[in-house]
Structures are given as C-alpha cells and as structure tokens.
Amino acid sequence: MRQAARTARYDPALGLEAYGLRAVDRPFPSHFHDHYVIGVVERGTRTLTCGRRRQVIGPGDVLLFNPGDSHACIQADGSLDYRGLNIPRSTMLALAEEVTGSRAMPGFSAAVVRDGELAGRLRALHWAVLGDKPELRREE
C-alpha cells in the first residue's frame, strides 16, 4: 500500500500555490474554495459531483473550479494521485486582463475537461513551481 502524502509550494512571482496529493483514499465531502482551482487527475478513478452534475473522473482529466463552486468526490477505483493549482481571485483577474484586455472575473463553464495537451501544460507548470524553476520557465 502506498503512503498518502501532500506537497505544496507557494510561488510569489506567479501568485499561486501548486500542490500534489498522493495515495488519497478518503472521500472529499461537499465543499468549496474562495479561489480558483485547476488540477489534473494522475491516478485513480473517482465520482465527482459539482453542482447538480455527477461524473466519473480519471487519469488525464483536468478539473476546473470557480470560487464558490460546491463539489465533492468519492473513490471509485484505486487511490487518488492529483496535482493542482490554487489561484487567488486577484491573480486570476490580473491574468484575465493580461490575456483579454478586459478587467472582468473569468469563469469556467465546465468542471471537467478531457484535453491531453492542456493536462501536459498544467503538469509542466506544476513541476516548475514545485521544483522552484526559474521564473521565465514558470511563466511560459
């Protein structure tokens, strides 16, 4: 049996926290965050409930939660390995303005996205933040 673990590191230059969960077997009861959460499931299958929608998530799935999105998940098969980014509203607002030119809070329309390229980019950013890589590499 694998040992459960959690790692986390805040990156002040990017204004976000990267964290990883390994070998998680416990359910996550319904909860929400005051910040944006973007994550990638690396291992295990879970049943995710977000709002009124229930779906099975597994390796490679990208999870997108807006601040205040109520969500819960329970184990379906195997323990969970997950990597995520916690992004404060202020950081997301600044990023949205930089990309769109508009100072408006963005919102995710779906809680789960199946996009291998996006998952790969998120993994690279996650590794760069946890590994304390040079700022230029993280900003890519």
Residue ranges of model-derived segments:
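Amphipathic alpha-helical segments enriched in hydrophobic/aromatic residues interleaved with Lys/Arg
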Residues: 98-140
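N-terminal regulatory/effector-sensing and dimerization cores
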Residues: 2-105
